[in-house]
């Protein structure tokens, strides 16, 4: 009798937690996407700062590949300085003009446009990063 009562309570608890687990998973995926967007934005801002304040005057370039939508790299003086591999569920796409983004010595971007991050488990949501002309300001929008 106690065994049946225990199994019944466990079954009831599992049924009550099941809808919540989908909601928790969705929230986890949203946070994963946001974190990736802010990581990319921070890397772009760091590139701009390095170009402005490094005495060596290296050129930093962010490169996004057409073939591999799960990574990007930053090159310094045409050598890989940083390579970032994204989660397999997150894809990165960008406009053609901004596939190779760098900043000049005044902090102005050489290309303007946007990057889009999407999560495979969240078809109705994405994060958009835009690089503003002249200032090079990076903005992150969630849609």
Briefly describe each language-model feature range.
Residues 16-38, 42, 46-49, 53, ...:
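N-terminal helix-rich module
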Residues 1-24:
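N-terminal single-pass transmembrane signal-anchor helix
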């Amino acid at each position: 009798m106690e065994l049946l009562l225990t199994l019944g309570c466990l079954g009831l608890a599992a049924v009550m937690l099941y809808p919540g687990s989908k909601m928790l998973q969705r929230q986890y995926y949203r946070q994963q996407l946001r974190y990736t967007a802010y990581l990319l934005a921070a890397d772009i801002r760091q590139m701009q700062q390095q170009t402005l304040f490094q005495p060596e005057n290296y050129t930093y370039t962010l490169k996004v590949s057409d073939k591999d939508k799960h990574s990007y790299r930053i090159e310094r003086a045409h050598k890989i300085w940083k390579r970032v591999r994204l989660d397999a569920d997150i894809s990165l796409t960008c406009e053609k003009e901004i596939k190779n983004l760098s900043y000049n010595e005044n902090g102005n971007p050489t290309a303007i446009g946007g990057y889009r991050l999407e999560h495979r488990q969240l078809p109705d949501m994405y994060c958009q990063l835009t690089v503003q002309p002249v200032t090079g300001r990076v903005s992150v929008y969630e849609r």
